[in-house]
Amino acid sequence: MTSSDYDPASEGAETDFSRRMSYGDYLALDAILGAQHPLSEAHDEMLFIIQHQTTELWMRLAIHELSAARRAIARDEVQPAMKMLARMSRIFEQLNNAWDVLRTMTPSEYTRFRSQLGQSSGFQSRQYRLIEYLLGNRNHAMLKPHAHDAEVTKLLEAELATPSLYDEVLRLADRNGLTMPAAVLSRDVRETHSFNEGVLQAWRVVYEAPETHWMLYELAEKLVDFEDYFRRWRFNHVTTVERVIGFKRGTGGTGGVSYLKRMLEVELFPELWRVRTIL
């Protein structure tokens, strides 16, 4: 028998799904594969749509993992949280690799359908904004693009009222023997955490004696590992946009590359990066 003659039913594989849930049913593939609606005849618009749709799917998983990691840390369940953070790094490794596919589209090819995008832009992504808020970058101005959608605004406002992932990590560290500044522990969580010398010195204790504070040391390195991948994703976003549109304004009205470059300056866990300088 050749492979072309092989019938999986001969070994007991199920082939009748008239009354059973199939692979496509479970994954709702009809809905997913029917969600691409190019607005032009340009061949490369399909690539552009699928690139962004798959990014949104990975972000859906990222939110799932980050939210669970934050809950686990708040309950002192650090080992499961570290597994989730490790997965977050792999998710953003996947997202970084995806830029290579989009870079196969040239400026000439993009201009054939760019006008069809109207004012839509990636900075309007509600999931990306939720990830930024979860991680502690709490720019209230970024609520404005969602003001037309009451449900999304409610979701983002609720996240702003919740301690960020890093807030929970600092509280965990305080519960486990590090002395975190009271002003940091009691701060308004709706605002972005800014660098604090007391937090830096607390992490210095961990990094100067990792064997004594192994759990916190390992957790800190998981955070740094993740932010490393996240920074690379932002950088790849900048270089891809510059490669495709140069320094034109973004479709959403931002400065395009100049806006994205400002995002490269954002530090999610500033003390974990600066502690390396003082060791």
Curated annotation (Swiss-Prot):
Cofactor binding comment, as recorded: Binds 1 heme group per subunit.
Record keyword DNA-binding present: no
SUPFAM superfamilies: Indolic compounds 2,3-dioxygenase-like
UniProt keyword annotations, A-Z: Dioxygenase, Heme, Iron, Metal-binding, Oxidoreductase, Tryptophan catabolism
Cofactor(s) required for function per UniProt: heme
GO terms of biological process kind: L-tryptophan catabolic process to acetyl-CoA; L-tryptophan catabolic process to kynurenine
Pathway membership, UniProt: Amino-acid degradation; L-tryptophan degradation via kynurenine pathway; L-kynurenine from L-tryptophan: step 1/2
Residue sites binding substrate per the record: F48, I49, I50, Q51, H52, Y110, R114, T251
Signal peptide: none
Pfam families: Trp_dioxygenase
GO molecular function annotations of the record: heme binding; metal ion binding; tryptophan 2,3-dioxygenase activity
UniProt EC number: 1.13.11.11
Binding-site list for heme: H237
Domain of life according to the entry: Bacteria
Metal-binding found in the keyword field: yes
Catalytic activity: L-tryptophan + O2 = N-formyl-L-kynurenine
Subunit structure: Homotetramer.
Similarity-based family: Belongs to the tryptophan 2,3-dioxygenase family.
Role of this protein: Heme-dependent dioxygenase that catalyzes the oxidative cleavage of the L-tryptophan (L-Trp) pyrrole ring and converts L-tryptophan to N-formyl-L-kynurenine. Catalyzes the oxidative cleavage of the indole moiety.
Protein name as it appears in the record: Tryptophan 2,3-dioxygenase
Organism encoding this protein: Bradyrhizobium diazoefficiens (strain JCM 10833 / BCRC 13528 / IAM 13628 / NBRC 14792 / USDA 110)
